[in-house]
């Protein structure tokens, strides 16, 4: 079976896959050591990124990070550690130091943080069903929101939704502002959205879907001056393009404004840009972004979506 999976993954990369994504923390008991090593071996052989949601134990436990760092070093796989702030929690500085040491020793490891302070996932996720999530996140039922209604849960409503709507989603509020500040100041940190799927506006999701980047520009660049404007922009554009260029040279034309680059441009006012999306009302548009250009075509004009404008094109890996 492992050999068959290896063939299928290689075929996917041949057909334009940009890398390998692994929700390891959500599949903790379903992925064997041999399967995990095989995935890293393919990423190393093909030199495409493998993005991993590492296994989590107790609060801030770095064993899951060390596991994937060792595999990346042994297989020469480009490793992307997702959501370092939400996984490392109060030990984010230690996690970043481990990544720094690995990179200094020749590894190729990157990571990202979100700009909103809650985690969002299914109420039936492995972390809730089979582990001490209250101890892990240092929260209780009252720190968890049912996304569909915005209500704060109790033990009784948690058990009710788990039983009656196991596919429903929750936001669990546990991330501290100082953790995100530590992460954002790491020299090559990237900012990610990671919103839950938004099928239509009637189905609630995370505010990440509409406010991630405007929150960085408004809160962390302008208001708190944690980042310079150029640093903030690089964390949301250039660094991602440079990372993904390992899989596709098309990304050499992304994340930068220069002759020959793709005309994907966000025009914003640094004095007014602000995220308005919040938990419970996740689709509120940001202010201070009057124009967005994709592939040379306006998709936002005077702050409004341009009806029928879909110029975006998928990018495939070089194979």
Annotate each PLM feature:
Residues 19-21, 51, 80, 110, ...:
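Structured core elements
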Residues 27-31, 57-61, 87-91, 117-121, ...:
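Flexible loop/turn segments at secondary-structure boundaries
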């Amino acid at each position: 079976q492992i050999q068959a999976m290896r063939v299928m993954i290689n075929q996917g990369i041949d057909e334009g896959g940009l890398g390998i994504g692994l929700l390891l923390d959500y599949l903790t008991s379903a992925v064997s050591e041999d399967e995990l090593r095989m995935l890293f071996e393919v990423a190393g052989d093909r030199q495409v990124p493998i993005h991993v949601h590492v296994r989590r134990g107790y609060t801030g436990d770095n064993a899951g990070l060390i596991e994937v760092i060792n595999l990346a070093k042994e297989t020469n796989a480009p490793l992307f550690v997702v959501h370092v702030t939400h996984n490392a929690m109060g030990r984010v500085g230690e996690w970043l130091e481990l990544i720094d040491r690995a990179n200094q020793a020749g590894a190729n490891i990157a990571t990202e943080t979100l700009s909103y302070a809650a985690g969002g996932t299914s109420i039936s996720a492995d972390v809730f069903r089979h582990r001490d999530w209250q101890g892990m996140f240092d929260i209780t039922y009252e720190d968890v929101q049912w996304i569909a209604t915005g209500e704060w849960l109790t033990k009784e409503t948690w058990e009710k939704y788990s039983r009656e709507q196991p596919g429903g989603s929750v936001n669990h509020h546990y991330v501290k502002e100082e953790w995100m500040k530590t992460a954002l100041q790491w020299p090559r940190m990237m900012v990610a959205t990671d919103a839950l799927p938004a099928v239509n506006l009637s189905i609630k999701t995370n505010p990440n879907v509409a406010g991630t980047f405007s929150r960085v520009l408004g809160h962390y660049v302008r208001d708190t001056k944690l980042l310079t404007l150029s640093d903030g922009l690089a964390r949301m554009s250039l660094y991602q393009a440079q990372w993904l260029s390992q899989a596709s040279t098309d990304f050499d034309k992304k994340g930068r404004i220069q002759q020959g680059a793709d005309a994907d441009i966000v025009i914003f006012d640094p004095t007014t840009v602000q995220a308005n999306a919040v938990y419970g009302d996740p689709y509120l548009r940001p202010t201070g972004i009057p124009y967005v250009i994709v592939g040379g075509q306006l998709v936002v004009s005077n702050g409004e979506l341009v009806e029928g404008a879909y110029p975006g094109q998928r990018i495939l890996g070089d194979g």
